[in-house]
Amino acid sequence: MRTLWIMAVLLVGVEGSLVELGKMILQETGKNPLTSYGAYGCNCGVGGRGKPKDATDRCCYVHKCCYKKMTDCDPKKDRYSYSWKDKTIVCGEKNSCLKELCECDKAVAICLRENLDTYNKKYKNNYLKPFCKKADAC
């Protein structure tokens, strides 16, 4: 639990409700979200942009597109609540904007789990994101 708290503190202010997003990724994939996805490919983590390197990176690309479609809330600041029931993420917000934010995060966590077999360690610490090729618009 302490590791999760440290991870959350490190991620605060990067994008979205990162405490919740980090928990979802950990629950769905069993991987540490910061060390496994914090700088993965061209789209996962801070400053992500560019043509996805693989299906795992595409999950992050789609997630960023999901955030861009939001107009009534701020994914960088707004927080939501969810629960983990029978190994399933349940978004519990009545506020439509916060529910949409939760659903975006839920979708990326599930996508990352479903694409664990495409996870490639050579893309894990990709700090050369400025050299990623331009991606298609969302």
UniProtKB/Swiss-Prot annotation:
Keywords: Antibiotic, Antimicrobial, Cytolysis, Disulfide bond, Myotoxin, Secreted, Signal, Toxin
Site (Hydrophobic membrane-disruption site (MDiS)) location in chain: 128, 131
Function in brief: Snake venom phospholipase A2 homolog that lacks enzymatic and anticoagulant activities. In mice, it induces conspicuous local myonecrosis, edema, and a systemic interleukin-6 response. In vitro, it is cytolytic upon myoblasts, and weakly bactericidal. A model of myotoxic mechanism has been proposed: an apo Lys49-PLA2 is activated by the entrance of a hydrophobic molecule (e.g. fatty acid) at the hydrophobic channel of the protein leading to a reorientation of a monomer.
Subcellular location: Secreted
Signal sequence, renumbered to the chain: 1-16
Residues annotated as site: Cationic membrane-docking site (MDoS): 129, 134
Region described as Important for membrane-damaging activities in eukaryotes and bacteria: spans on this chain: 121-134
A GO CC term assigned to this protein in UniProt: extracellular region
Similarity field: Belongs to the phospholipase A2 family. Group II subfamily. K49 sub-subfamily.
Protein name per the record: Phospholipase A2 homolog 1
Positions bearing the site annotation: Important residue of the cationic membrane-docking site (MDoS): 121, 124
GO terms assigned for molecular function: calcium ion binding; calcium-dependent phospholipase A2 activity; phospholipid binding; toxin activity
